From Swiss-Prot:
Homodimer. One of its GO terms (biological process) is DNA repair. GO terms for cellular component: nucleus. SMART domains: EXOIII (SM00479). This is Three prime repair exonuclease 2.
Length: 236
């Protein structure tokens, strides 16, 4: 198996959606932070020595009104509802969203590595479903990194698989608290979770960059979460 291409830009991604995978969810919010590799290799710190987000950073956050209703739990966790999104005049995941995403990604130096926490089980398959419904694609050399198995794998290597390591929680909130002794802000908003994810990545940047270089998965190998119904064309 050949190694993935060395990514020059890392695009940190989070989705908020209408429910869990078994509910055939639809995306209601997406947020992306694009960071050049050089900014991850040389993290910035404030006067107190605390990690801060890179100064050169592209952001994109979009809300959209899905056709499927939110589960009660998803609405409670995300603070989003079909009613609030409709009231604010938000369309669904359509051709305009795809063109915006593609334009955002085209501004970044490639190859691009998409980064999400639990991405292989949720964010990447769901994004793949929405894109497939519209017949849309990402750049062919795009790769993906899921920080959940990556951080577990790195810790397992350091601890030699001890029982204590197996009891650790790897939720975003638990990782952030473990690394920074604080609670993350704006949890379960897409942008808030991407902010948290990027700081977690910066805390382990050398190891995670090396992991990505060796084990990132090609976007072409991501399977959709479910077979989407026929939707509107990209002209929508």
């Amino acid at each position: 198996m050949s190694e993935p291409p060395r990514a020059e830009t890392f695009v940190f991604l989070d989705l908020e959606a209408t429910g869990l995978p078994n509910m055939d969810p639809e995306i209601a919010e997406i947020s992306l932070f694009a960071v050049h590799r050089s900014s991850l290799e040389n993290p910035e710190r404030d006067d107190s020595g605390s990690l801060v987000l890179p100064r050169v950073l592209d952001k994109l956050t979009l809300c959209m009104c899905p056709e499927r209703p939110f589960t009660a739990k998803a609405s409670e966790i995300t603070g989003l509802s079909s009613e609030s999104l409709m009231h604010c005049g938000k369309a669904g995941f359509n051709g305009a969203v795809v063109r915006t995403l593609q334009g955002f990604l085209s501004r970044q130096e490639g190859p691009i590595c998409l980064v999400a926490h639990n991405g292989f089980d949720y964010d990447f398959p769901l994004l793949c479903t929405e894109l497939q419904r519209l017949g849309a694609h990402l750049p062919q050399d795009t790769v993906c990194l899921d920080t959940l198995p990556a951080l577990r794998g790195l810790d397992r290597a350091h601890s030699h698989g001890t029982r204590a390591q197996g009891r650790k929680s790897y939720s975003l909130a638990s990782l952030f608290h473990r690394y920074f002794q604080a609670e993350p802000s704006a949890a379960h908003s897409a942008e808030g979770d991407v902010h948290t994810l990027l700081l977690i990545f910066l805390h382990r940047a050398p190891e995670l960059l090396a992991w990505a270089d060796e084990q990132a998965r090609s976007w072409a190998h991501i399977e959709p979460m479910y077979v989407p119904p026929d939707g509107p064309s990209l002209e929508a």
